[in-house]
Structures are given as structure tokens and as C-alpha cells.
Regions:
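Short, flexible loop segments at boundaries between secondary-structure elements
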Residues: 75, 79, 166-193
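Active-site and ligand/interface coordination hotspots across diverse enzymes
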Residues: 1-76, 161-175, 200-216
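Short catalytic/ligand-binding loop motif for oxyanion handling, primarily in non-cytosolic enzymes
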Residues: 54-57, 114-115, 151-155, 188-191
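Internal catalytic-core helix/loop-beta-alpha segment
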Residues: 100-159
């Protein structure tokens, strides 16, 4: 059974007029998706978004806005059992599938905005520090941060490039936890496609042990 809050809209899509109400200072706009150790579930891959969009906050589901390529690319990579439509909320069956596979989802910053570039540099930096503080307890095998620009700001790594990072370059990053940066899957990112994102997810899933090298 999920411990996450149900969609504030009761399983329907938000209207355009409703979205503005979710642009609040609250730092817990959306609940994390995390495997439950009490159920014997192990966190292998922790996917970290930048921050929730307004649609995502409206339905309490990660990457929920239609047109976001996160869920289609995750499925194409073989990381979900079926295509996921989170536009009205995350189906408990899909959440359970992620947890069984050892996949968790969180954000650098919990405040919902219409666009990620509305966040301040200090919000991103504090979000980066907060993630580092959480890692000793969460203990994922691999962390994948979705967004190179936010990563550069959060961790003062202006020359960082997409792909596998050097964790030792991040102050306080726990030993033994791999770190990757993948492209932002938003439809606003013209440099990424569902296919290219799927390739990125396969790479990080192999690092985390979610997929095996001979997986299709």
C-alpha cells in the first residue's frame, strides 16, 4: 500500500485556471517515490528531478505533465512494466512496480514552479546539500540527476558534462554511491528525444543493477 498522499484533484487532470494555485512557497509540493525497506525493497537507483512543475504538484505525481518524456523514455528503457500515464496521478500499481525494481524518485528542490528557471541559485545549492545529507540514510547504488544546468549550479561544477560524474568532486558525497547526470526530460528540452533519454536511463540502470548487461 502506498504511503503517498492521493492526488489533490481526486484523479482528474488540472485545468489551466487551477495550476496557479500550486505555485506556493511550500517545500513539500510532491511526495517522493521510495522503496520501503520494511517490505524488503532496496533502493538501487535514485532519480532526482530539479523541482516539481505545477501540474506535477496538482496531481502529486512525478513528471506528470503531458508531453514530458520521462515516463515514455523510462518505459522504452525497460524500467517500467507498462506505459505510465501520470497526468492524473501515479497509479499505485505503477508505484509498486518502481519500488519492486528498486527505483526511487525525488527532487533537488521541493517548491513547485511553472518553470525550473524560476528557482534561485541558493535554492538549488541548498537542495544539493540536502540531497547529500539524505544519501547516507537512503543508500542508493546510483543517483541520476535529471538536468545538467541545475546540477552545475547546485554543486558548483560549472564545467560538468552529461554522463557519469566523479562523486569525490562533490563535498560530502558518500563513498560507494555512483553519480550520473542525464538530460532534463521536459518537452522544453529540444536536445533530447525519447530514444536518447532511454539510452541514458539504460546506462544508469546498469550502473545501479536495475538492469543487467544482457537485458533487452
Amino acid at each position: 500500500m502506498s504511503t503517498r498522499r492521493p492526488s489533490p484533484l481526486g484523479g482528474r487532470r488540472p485545468t489551466r485556471a487551477e495550476l496557479a494555485a500550486f505555485a506556493t512557497p511550500a517545500t513539500d509540493a510532491i511526495d517522493d517515490v521510495l522503496p520501503d525497506a520494511a517490505r524488503g525493497e532496496e533502493l538501487r537507483l535514485l532519480i532526482v528531478g530539479i523541482n516539481p512543475g505545477l501540474w506535477t504538484a496538482a496531481v502529486n505525481a512525478p513528471f506528470a505533465r503531458p508531453g514530458n518524456r520521462f515516463w515514455p523514455s523510462l518505459h522504452r528503457a525497460g524500467l517500467t512494466a507498462r506505459p505510465v500515464d501520470a497526468s492524473t496521478g501515479l497509479d499505485p500499481e505503477d508505484e509498486a512496480d518502481l519500488r519492486r525494481r528498486g527505483i526511487g524518485i525525488t527532487n533537488l528542490v521541493g517548491r513547485a514552479t511553472a518553470r525550473a528557471d524560476e528557482l534561485t541559485r541558493e535554492e538549488l545549492r541548498e537542495g544539493g546539500r540536502a540531497l547529500v545529507r539524505r544519501l547516507p540514510e537512503l543508500r542508493p547504488r546510483t543517483v541520476a540527476i535529471a538536468g545538467i544546468t541545475a546540477f552545475r549550479t547546485a554543486y558548483s561544477q560549472p564545467r560538468a558534462r552529461l554522463g557519469r560524474q566523479v562523486p569525490a568532486a562533490i563535498d560530502g558525497w558518500p563513498a560507494g554511491i555512483a553519480l550520473h547526470v542525464v538530460p532534463q526530460p521536459s518537452g522544453l528540452n529540444a536536445h533530447a528525444t525519447v530514444d536518447s533519454l532511454a539510452d541514458d536511463w539504460r546506462e544508469v540502470a546498469l550502473s545501479a543493477g536495475v538492469l543487467r548487461a544482457n537485458s533487452d
